[in-house]
Amino acid sequence: MVVSHLNRTVTSLNELFEHHAHFAGLSDISISEDIPVEGDISVPVGSQNADNDFSTLDEPVKDTILRDLRAVGQKFVHVMYPKKSSALLRDWDLWGPLLLCVTLALMLQGGSADSEEDGRPQFAEVFVIIWFGSVIITLNSKLLGGTISFFQSLCVLGYCILPLTVAMIVCRIVLLGGSGVVSFAVRLIVVTASFSWSTFASTAFLADSQPTNRKALVVYPVFLFYFVIGWMILTFSPSH
């Protein structure tokens, strides 16, 4: 037993010396001064191109404005020819809605001949109705379980005012010839068609983001929203 115990002790000591020799060898390893500790971090060409496509830091202001205007124009096309496309939702912006809102408010101001403040309250009224109404509809959509984001909904509702803005332009042109029965009938047809198109276009984009059993609860406020704007356009009378 003593001999076997001594053998195990000798074996353990040999293993210890071997490990010590192994680590001692590692301590002799050093970095040669002839080898430069430096290098280049290269990025694949495809990644560089992808980053450059979305970078606007070095882009002229003119190109940026033109690109944004083209994007707004493409969204106008989506509204006039609504279809099941996520482009309006994916690439949302508020420049188009702001432009349409200001244009519509400017054309509606001064509509009352009895206005003593040159139409300023009417401009504010149109501006507040459009944006406040859009916010209320968006909150209603979110509370009903809609999956669309807040700003995406504002974008859709704002861009879908385009048919009503076109109707306002047509009504202003028709009113240049007078405000008789024929003029009212023409304006009624134009506003009704534009109201229907705005409602149809907005629901085409928003319907898929709502639960199936709650779509009617979302469409009804949209109907009222565009109806109020259409009524303001139909009852517009230029000041003299």
From Swiss-Prot:
Primary location group: Golgi
Topological category with respect to the lipid bilayer: Multi-pass membrane protein
UniProt keyword annotation of Transmembrane present: yes
Lumenal-side segments: 113-125, 171-172, 237-240
Pfam family, one: Yip1
One annotated Gene Ontology cellular component of this protein: Golgi medial cisterna
Key words, A-Z: Golgi apparatus, Membrane, Transmembrane, Transmembrane helix
Any one GO biological process: endoplasmic reticulum to Golgi vesicle-mediated transport
Chain segments annotated as transmembrane: 92-112, 126-146, 150-170, 173-193, 216-236
Cytoplasmic topology ranges: 1-91, 147-149, 194-215
Subcellular location, record wording: Golgi apparatus membrane
Parts forming coiled coils: none
Similarity annotation: Belongs to the YIP1 family.
Protein name as catalogued: Protein YIPF6
Protein encoded by which gene: yipf6
